[in-house]
Amino acid sequence: MASGLPHPVLLSDLVGLGHINVGGQSVEFKHVFYTWCVMAMLFAVSFIVRGKIKMVPGKLQNIFEVIIGGLEEFVVSITGEDGRKVYPVLIVFFLFILCMNLTGLVPGFDAPTANINTTASLALFCFIYYNYIGIQRWGAGYIKHFMGPMWWLSPLMLPLELISHTARPLSLSLRLFGNIRGEEFVLILFFMLAPIIGTIPIYFLFTLAKVLQAFIFFMLATIYLKGSLEHAH
């Protein structure tokens, strides 16, 4: 927490998992703890919902089908029909990041995505996954397209392409981390300046912002996968 800001009472500290000792050194562990909480919640909800899916959907099931189906059509509109094969990974990205973002609005919790290690891990997985899909689909042709359309351009194109692709996980991780961490600080400042009731409108604004950040990550991952699924020019 920044100097001068009050330290909130966190669940991770109450259960003794805010920090752990590794080799005699105190290491911050709270964001791993909250990530586990989100994973446990998602697994529990998935298990419960799975048993309640009906052929004739109710209102809640209809809402989820519209959201999930709408996001799938969004992916297909960008990547083509091949996007349906990678959609399960993309929707897990969206839901996982969304839940981690929203965790920061729950009293006693901190958003795991407010830690650079969490966002860097997500971005690195995305980077490895879309390159794996490209190599799996096109083989050596995927690597070849980094060198440009003509062989004599390869000394120029190869470094540029490598820098461009390497910058992707960096930008993904820093964008998500910076926005979520900044919102956490702003929320603390509002709590200092206004009563709890006065901060309720800010909660709605931050909820929208956290949904938007999850969607931006989802959209960029979709665009990167589009490049992997397309034929290397």
Swiss-Prot record:
Membrane-crossing segments per the record: 29-49, 60-80, 89-109, 115-135, 143-163, 185-205, 206-226
Gene Ontology MF term list: proton-transporting ATP synthase activity, rotational mechanism
Coiled coil ranges: none
Alphabetical keyword list: ATP synthesis, Cell inner membrane, Cell membrane, CF(0), Hydrogen ion transport, Ion transport, Membrane, Transmembrane, Transmembrane helix, Transport
BP GO annotations: proton motive force-driven plasma membrane ATP synthesis
Task performed by this protein: Key component of the proton channel; it plays a direct role in the translocation of protons across the membrane.
Quaternary state and interactors: F-type ATPases have 2 components, CF(1) - the catalytic core - and CF(0) - the membrane proton channel. CF(1) has five subunits: alpha(3), beta(3), gamma(1), delta(1), epsilon(1). CF(0) has three main subunits: a(1), b(2) and c(9-12). The alpha and beta chains form an alternating ring which encloses part of the gamma chain. CF(1) is attached to CF(0) by a central stalk formed by the gamma and epsilon chains, while a peripheral stalk is formed by the delta and b chains.
Protein name, as recorded: ATP synthase subunit a
Annotated source species: Oleidesulfovibrio alaskensis (strain ATCC BAA-1058 / DSM 17464 / G20)
